[in-house]
Amino acid sequence: MNQLESLKQFTTVVADTGDFRQLGQFKPQDATTNPSLILKAVQKADYQPLLKETVARFKGRALDEVMDRLLVRFGCEILSIIPGRVSTEVDARLSFDANASYTRGERIVELYQAEGIHIDRVLIKVAATWEGIQAAERLERRGIHTNLTLLFSFCQAVACGQARVQLISPFVGRIYDWYKKSAGAAWDEAANAGANDPGVKSVRQIYNHYKHFGIATEVMGASFRNAGQITALAGCDLLTISPELLAQLAASEAPLARSLDAGAARSLDLPAVNYDETGFRYALNEDAMATEKLAEGIRAFAADAIKLEQLMVAA
C-alpha cells in the first residue's frame, strides 16, 4: 500500500488544483480551487477554449459576474470527476466587506444551482478576516457551507469555530515559509521537520482544540511544501494537496501512521477560549506571522483575480 492509499484510511484526501484533467489518477474525494489556481489553469492550451466559451457566452455582463461564471464552470467540470465537494472562492478584494462577501457567496451558489449542482457539493471560500468570518456565519445560516481560507492563527480558528463554519483551511506551508525566512541562516531544517514543523504544530493545536471542545467545524490542512508536512498530519479531517505532492505520496511505499487522533484530543487538558471582535483583532495583531501572511495572501489572490479579469477582457 502506498502512502496516498494509507493516508486515505485516516484522512479525506482533497486535490488542490484547477487543472481538473489531473484529478482522475488520484481519486480524491473533494477538490479546492482559488483564483491563482484557475489563473494557472487557463494559461494552459487545454483550458483556453473553456475561457473563451465562457467569455463569449456572457459577453456584455459585468466582469465580476463573468469571473464567477468561469470559476463555476471549472467547479462543474471538477464535480463531474469527483464524488464530493468543490471549494470556490469569493473575490479576495471583498475580504474586508462582510455584506459584499455574503452577496457574492450567495451568487456563486445560485450559479451552481442553475447548473443542477446541489448546494451540499459546494463550499464557498472566504478569507478568515473578521468580516469574512461574519459573512460565513450568515451564509451558514442560509444553508450555504463555507471554507475559511488564509487561516494562519489560533484566534482565526477559534472565531471560525464560534461562527460554526463548515470547514477551515490552515495554511501549513506558508506558516513554515515565514518561520524559515525569519530564522535566516539559523534555520535548522531537520529540527523543524515533521511534528516540529511550525505549520504542522499550528494545525495540531487547532485540531486538538476543536476535537476537545466538540466543535463540528472540519479542519483541512492546506498549502504544503513537502510530503513530510502531509504525513505528519495523517488523521486530520481533510488535507488538500497539490497534484505534484499527491504523485509523491502515491510513489512512496514508506509506512504511514496516524498522527492526529480525536479521541486523544478529547482527553487533553485545554483551556476554553473565545473571541469577540476586539479580542480577535488584538490577538491577530499580536501574531506577526499571521498578520503578515494574511495580508500577503489577500494581496496575492486579489492580484491574480485582476490578472484573470485581464485575460477575460483579452479573450
From Swiss-Prot:
Broad class of where this protein is predominantly found: cytoplasm
Cellular localisation: Cytoplasm
Pathway(s) annotated for this protein in UniProt: Carbohydrate degradation; pentose phosphate pathway; D-glyceraldehyde 3-phosphate and beta-D-fructose 6-phosphate from D-ribose 5-phosphate and D-xylulose 5-phosphate (non-oxidative stage): step 2/3
Superkingdom of origin organism: Bacteria
InterPro entries linked: Aldolase_TIM, TAL/FSA, Transaldolase_1, Transaldolase_AS
Family matches, as Pfam families: TAL_FSA
Keywords assigned by UniProt, alphabetized: Cytoplasm, Pentose shunt, Schiff base, Transferase
Gene Ontology CC terms, in alphabetical order: cytoplasm
Gene Ontology biological process terms in this record: carbohydrate metabolic process; pentose-phosphate shunt, non-oxidative branch
Transferase listed as a keyword: yes
Name of this protein: Transaldolase
